[in-house]
């Protein structure tokens, strides 16, 4: 029996994993163009943020916010390197790791070659996560440069149209960085599902589909999205104020 025939269900599970991850990424990008979602709504808030920044002389708070966002990406990039080091350590002692997994009752036994492929796939997911978070950090650096080069209020030679264009560009750069951060988080979510692959390929496929459902609900139907798109109505005038009027 060939390697493919012996591990057909594992290979099908890996293909299903790629379809779930890549398919949801494409779907979320397509649906977000004409549907309110976290990414599109936050981009509108970033545009408001940049327009209001141009009305302030002191931009320390704006630079601080971008710095905090960059540190979040830096934390995940550093954590990813630690995870990769652990995966490579296990890969170096794969024979012992396979024997330890075989002692767990719920774990479906697999060959050493298949177990090494699983570890390599898991490592590839977190390599992608590292490059994504590092690119996110660089884009936040670009955003910090844009904030530093923003025109001041007293610069009369800068037209209103140029200010609006600058605010749109700066908001777009920040949104691009946030999208990369989102892609990195997704790689963590899907990377966690690969742990189920060591238990059972069926559980792996189920967990992959479950992560897609969780991501979809959070992106398009979460409570925080409802709060951000909510537009409050005009507050009623108190009775005392009506009598005074």
Regions found by a protein language model. Give the residues of each.
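Membrane-proximal helix-loop-helix units in multi-pass membrane proteins
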Residues: 96-111, 116-153
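Transmembrane alpha-helical segments and their cytosolic interface motifs
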Residues: 64-88, 115, 176-207
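Juxtamembrane "helix exit" motif at the C-terminal ends of alpha-helical transmembrane segments
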Residues: 1-2, 83-108, 197-216
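Hydrophobic alpha-helical transmembrane segments
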Residues: 4-15, 106-122, 201-206
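Membrane-interface amphipathic/juxtamembrane segments adjacent to transmembrane helices
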Residues: 28-69
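Cytosolic/matrix-facing juxtamembrane and C-terminal tails of multi-pass cellular membrane proteins
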Residues: 3, 148-157, 162-171, 218-245
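Alpha-helical transmembrane segments of helical membrane proteins, especially in multi-pass transport
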Residues: 128-197
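Hydrophobic alpha-helical membrane-embedded segments
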Residues: 10-38, 74-88, 119-142, 189
